């Protein structure tokens, strides 16, 4: 059953209350008519009009038109008493001032009684009707809410009001000891801490848990997820309460907890002042701007109010999409320029540099699909190595201040074409970082990003939706994971810290077993592992069981910021690197590529 809209509900209550107020006055008159001699009808009409106006004013003041009356309790009925009494007192005082006759007090007493009984009764009637006739007709699942703050309270009241959510809030838990035993509504109280959830789930037969604490730590979220995994309970997150209060999102816009939420980490506090100096009122160029990382870098850069962002990419559809998105959100204060260009075409790239003269370049354009590049090594070399060389040399010729290359953990001791090409691309930009250069060149290296195109998570999700099985290459295979927004924010921070020549390595946290990731995705999709199944297909060409973040020459990294490390790197001579690149393009062999990348 669809809930009545707020405006229609407000109008219905005004009409009902207007009828009740008028009826109360005339009913009082009918009861007291034998005693009403000597009083004019003007008193009756005037009393009705003043009481009607004052009732609506006090009903608004005491919030009678915006409460969830279907779950009214003592506090709601006290508001009715205050509104009714206040309106009667005001009416009595105004009538005394406006007419010469002394008010008939018995009339106002009877009117007050009828007014109170009928207004309160109308609200209680809706509560009874809703609970016994509507609620019983809709199956609602027992729900536990984590968090008894403002967000949790708003969410619980909305669940009680809404039939569409199909959730019945039973209790809340909160780690704040001051909130223990606190009553949120007549039917929902705080009955423990997060650690009590397993016991409470069994006791109250909980089917759903909703996280209503936006600042809940990653550790706590994973603990709750493990409980849900054991007990077979669905886990959701409510939207940020600020977005709810601003009207941007509805409180019932719940989101199932995804694997990205579980593998994410508590956010790093960025040095906003330092990054602002690098980005605010500047022209920024992002290559690969339509890709997963490139588009998120554009979003993050936009938050610092640059003057202009050049969105450069080879795929017209993805560039069009990110241009539309950013123009809609930030177009009133930032100029976004979509540029279709191939990084393999140096003449075109140099034209772009000379035309827009960017302050900084974030180079995210790359082929990153490991198995696919094993079949297309020449294209990987041209795009990842030659493309990086073209963009970096053009940036140097255009006297760009900062050049930040997005690299990968697969560039460390690479065993595949993709990783090897990214490692040599790092060598290219390190060779360009000369003492007399006006451009500072830096690489930022990190692992897999969650949800990026071609990554394992979308693949697993598709396999689960198709009924399985989920294919994992090896039971011991591990990977580092990071969310796209976190990686992009840390890229901006590393770029702001760069002096030139560094390879920055992002702290990826603990490596995750791919088989455990698959199991988590199956459970979060509401399926059972035995129904979907997991098959081991064997390691594919170029894959490693585990990834590294530093090679043997880069050990003992220096931490320069939270979750950002600077690896010790060697300097490369540009003429030698140029010869290596030319030789790989003209005389390719995989053995040669891997040998150079691993030296």
Swiss-Prot record:
Function, in words: Required for the biosynthesis of type 1 capsular polysaccharide.
Organism, scientific name: Staphylococcus aureus
Bilayer topology: Multi-pass membrane protein
Pathway(s): Capsule biogenesis; capsule polysaccharide biosynthesis
Family annotation (InterPro entries): NAD(P)-bd_dom_sf, Polysac_CapD-like, Polysaccharide_Synthase-Rel, SAM-dependent_MTases_sf
Domain of life according to the entry: Bacteria
Cellular component aspect of the GO annotation: plasma membrane
Pfam families on file: CoA_binding_3, Polysacc_synt_2
Transmembrane parts of this sequence: 12-32, 41-61, 79-99, 102-122
Family according to the record: Belongs to the polysaccharide synthase family.
Keywords tagged on the record: Capsule biogenesis/degradation, Cell membrane, Exopolysaccharide synthesis, Membrane, Transmembrane, Transmembrane helix
GO terms classed as biological process: capsule polysaccharide biosynthetic process
Name this protein carries in UniProt: Capsular polysaccharide biosynthesis protein CapD
Matching PANTHER family: POLYSACCHARIDE BIOSYNTHESIS PROTEIN EPSC-RELATED, UDP-N-ACETYLGLUCOSAMINE 4,6-DEHYDRATASE
Entry coiled-coil feature ranges: none
Compartment(s): Cell membrane
């Amino acid at each position: 059953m669809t809930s009545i809209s707020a405006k229609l509900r407000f109008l219905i209550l005004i009409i009902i209350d207007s009828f009740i107020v008028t009826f109360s006055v005339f009913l009082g008159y009918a009861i007291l008519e034998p005693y009403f001699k000597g009083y004019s009808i003007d008193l009756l009409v005037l009393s009705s009009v003043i009481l009607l106006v004052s009732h609506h004013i006090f009903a608004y003041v005491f919030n009678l038109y915006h409460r969830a009356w279907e779950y009214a309790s003592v506090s709601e009925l006290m508001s009715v008493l205050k509104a009714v009494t206040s309106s009667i007192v005001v009416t009595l005082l105004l009538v005394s001032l406006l007419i010469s006759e002394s008010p008939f007090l018995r009339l106002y007493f009877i009117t007050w009684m009828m007014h109170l009984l009928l207004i309160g009764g109308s609200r209680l009637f809706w509560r009874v009707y809703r609970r016994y006739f509507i609620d019983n007709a809709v199956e609602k699942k027992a729900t536990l809410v984590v968090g008894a703050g403002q967000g949790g309270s708003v969410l619980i009241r909305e669940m009680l009001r809404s039939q569409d959510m199909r959730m019945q809030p039973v209790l809340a838990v909160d780690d704040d000891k001051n909130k223990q035993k606190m009553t949120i509504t007549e039917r929902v109280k705080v009955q423990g801490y997060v650690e009590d959830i397993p016991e409470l789930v069994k006791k109250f037969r909980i089917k759903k848990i909703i996280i209503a604490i936006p600042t809940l730590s990653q550790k706590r979220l994973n603990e709750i997820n493990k409980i849900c995994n054991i007990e077979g309970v669905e886990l959701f997150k409510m939207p940020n309460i600020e977005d709810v209060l601003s009207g941007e999102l509805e409180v019932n816009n719940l989101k199932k907890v995804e694997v990205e939420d579980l593998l994410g980490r508590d956010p790093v506090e960025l040095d906003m002042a330092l990054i602002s100096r690098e980005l605010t009122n500047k022209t920024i160029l992002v290559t690969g701007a339509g890709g997963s990382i490139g588009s998120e870098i554009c979003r993050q850069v936009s938050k610092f109010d640059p003057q202009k962002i050049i969105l450069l990419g080879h795929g017209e559809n993805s560039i069009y999409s990110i241009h539309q998105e950013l123009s809609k959100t930030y177009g009133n204060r930032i100029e976004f320029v979509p540029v279709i260009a191939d990084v393999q075409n140096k003449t075109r790239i140099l034209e772009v540099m000379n035309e827009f003269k960017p302050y900084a370049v974030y180079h995210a354009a790359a082929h990153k699909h490991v198995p696919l590049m094993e079949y297309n090594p020449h294209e990987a070399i041209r795009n990842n190595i030659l493309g990086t060389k073209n963009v970096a040399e053009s940036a140097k010729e255009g006297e760009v201040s900062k050049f930040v290359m997005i690299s990968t953990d697969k560039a460390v001791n690479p065993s595949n074409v993709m990783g090897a090409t990214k490692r040599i691309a790092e060598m290219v930009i390190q060779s360009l970082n000369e003492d007399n250069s006006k451009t500072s060149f830096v690489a930022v290296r990190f692992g897999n990003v969650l949800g990026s195109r071609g990554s394992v998570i979308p693949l697993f999700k598709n396999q689960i939706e198709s009924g399985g099985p989920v294919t994992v290459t090896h039971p011991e295979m591990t990977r580092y994971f990071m969310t796209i927004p976190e990686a992009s924010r840390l890229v901006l921070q590393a770029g702001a810290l760069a002096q030139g020549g560094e390879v920055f390595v992002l702290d990826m946290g603990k490596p995750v077993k791919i088989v455990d990731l698959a199991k988590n995705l199956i459970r979060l999709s509401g399926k059972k592992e035995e129904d979907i199944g997991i098959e081991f297909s064997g390691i594919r060409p170029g894959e490693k069981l585990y990834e590294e973040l530093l090679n043997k020459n880069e050990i003992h990294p220096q931490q320069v910021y939270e979750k950002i490390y600077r690896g010790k790197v060697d300097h490369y001579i540009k003429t030698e690197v140029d010869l290596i690149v030319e030789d790989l393009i003209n005389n390719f062999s995989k053995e040669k590529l891997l040998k150079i990348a691993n030296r």
